[in-house]
Amino acid sequence: MLALNYSLYDCFAQMPFQGHTAAVIDLVQKLDHGLAVKIAKELCQTVTCFVWNDSGHTWVKTISKDGSVWPINHGLLGVARNCLGVQGNGVLDTVSGSFEVRTKGNTVTISLPKLKLDIAEMPERLTQAFDIMPVSVREMGKTCVVELRTVEEIINLETDFNRISKLDYDRVVLTAEDDTVPFDYVCRYFSPKHNINENNGSLYIQTFLAVFWQERLQKNNLSFLQLSPRRAIGRISMSEKLIEVEAPVCKTFEGVLKVL
């Protein structure tokens, strides 16, 4: 029997039970992939992050509740808080790259690569799925980003997840400028093909949303609100090649997981 220390963290959350929950499991050494998938499915969090040290490096492997491996994800914020506590800095190594992180109090900052969106046409089936009239449409691979005119349009979306799941895109992100303090833009993120009707708080989408809004607003420092049911907040700082995402992270649970 294995006895594994694990914790739950609410990421992008100023207080518990907001933002997006991630499980973090401390390991003595790397776990067999099949066993890691089994554990992630049993915990049934959106992501479970397995963390171990090897030759001075902190390695992270993130597995979703459907057993797939996720690269950049909100769980990295929880891992940083778990490893560094309330004050520190370090590097997290993953299969998709290394990410510098630091913590101060309940705030975690992580450096991520910038991703660029391409201009795209608005698919007719997308307008049917959301009943919207976009300002602009961007895409990157299987991700579609739709800009709307007002925050109210984002809030009042009527979603048909059955239709969304039949789109050619794996991810659909809707966003709008927010002209009220303290946020610069808002967003919502739908991914029923990944068994997540609406994502509660995504780190990954900020790698391209921040770039989009930097160009649109001509600002290098931005703040965002993800208008999911649990809401998620964060700040962005832009450099030439990287973005820094700063987000509050709350620890909500710790315990021992016994695995037969």
Q: Where in the sequence are the language-model features?
A:
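Active-site proximal loop and beta-alpha junction motif in alpha/beta enzyme cores
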Residues: 1-260
